[in-house]
From Swiss-Prot:
One of its GO terms (cellular component) is cytosolic large ribosomal subunit. Part of the 50S ribosomal subunit. It comes from Geotalea uraniireducens (strain Rf4) (Geobacter uraniireducens). Keywords: Repressor, Ribonucleoprotein, Ribosomal protein, RNA-binding, rRNA-binding, Translation regulation, tRNA-binding. Belongs to the universal ribosomal protein uL1 family. Pfam families: Ribosomal_L1. SUPFAM superfamilies: Ribosomal protein L1. NCBIfam families: rplA_bact (TIGR01169). This is Large ribosomal subunit protein uL1. InterPro entries: Ribosom_uL1_bac-type, Ribosomal_uL1, Ribosomal_uL1-like, Ribosomal_uL1/biogenesis, Ribosomal_uL1_3-a/b-sand, Ribosomal_uL1_CS. Binds directly to 23S rRNA. The L1 stalk is quite mobile in the ribosome, and is involved in E site tRNA release. It comes from the Bacteria.
Length: 233
């Protein structure tokens, strides 16, 4: 596929051999976004872990201080009082076997799934459908809980789940290019802080090896790891 003129222009603005400060990197990403839609800003972090070993797995979640700039559709598997709690908190879809049946028929019009622990037997029936889509509730990221009100609020506020991939890389959205630079900065630092706090004790050597940031359609911009790390509180 030929490289578009706009992408070529964006690529020309980025020095791929350079590592930019967080401030300059964010400005560059905002300036190289060229799509007609409001692009998402994504961060990729290469970690010094080998996820093939269970004791080096990095997985968790973080509530970004400035959200993601999008409406997150939340589904909750719950019954009784917890069903009411989920609805009162603003969940978009709440139910049990009825939702399982819908999903078995191919319905996936939601972004996050939460379940109370007593519902996991029911949810397990559709694990093979939810898992590959990253929608399976998991206690490690706070989506299997009796505190459904809090879980719904966090998801609606911009909770991002992260999980290290085979190559030791974590990908996560941190907002929109339309965000103020300071808001993107705060979100990126919150993500990096969460990654640092999730460092496995078995990880040796340099933990955060590389950080890059990009818009949905734009080029990747390498960040100076030491500059970013020095700003993490």
């Amino acid at each position: 596929m030929p490289t578009s003129k706009k992408l070529k222009e964006a690529l020309a603005k980025v020095d791929r051999s350079k590592s930019y400060t967080l401030k300059d990197g964010i400005e560059l990403v905002k300036n190289t976004a060229f799509a007609k839609f409001t692009e998402t800003v994504d961060v990729a972090v290469r970690l010094g872990v080998d996820p093939r070993h269970a004791d080096q797995m990095v997985r968790g979640a973080v509530v970004l201080p400035n959200g993601l700039g999008k409406d997150v559709r939340v589904l909750v598997f719950a019954k009784g009082e917890k069903e009411k709690e989920a609805r009162d908190a603003g969940a978009d879809f709440v139910g049990a076997d009825d939702l399982v049946a819908k999903i078995q028929e191919g319905w996936f019009d939601f972004d996050t799934a939460i379940a109370t622990p007593d519902m996991m037997g029911v949810v397990g029936k559709i694990g093979k459908l939810l898992g590959p889509r990253g929608l399976m509730p998991n206690p490690k990221v706070g989506t299997v809980t009796f505190d459904v009100g809090r879980a719904v609020n966090e998801s609606k506020s911009g909770k991002v789940e992260f999980r290290v991939e085979k190559a030791g890389i974590i990908h996560a959205p941190v907002g929109k290019v339309s965000f103020d630079a300071d808001k993107l900065k705060e979100n990126i630092l919150a993500l990096v802080d969460a990654l640092v706090k999730s460092k496995p004790s078995a990880a040796k050597g340099t933990y955060i090896k590389k950080i890059s940031v990009s818009s949905t359609m734009g080029p990747g911009v390498n960040l100076d790891v030491s500059d970013v790390s020095s700003q993490v509180v």
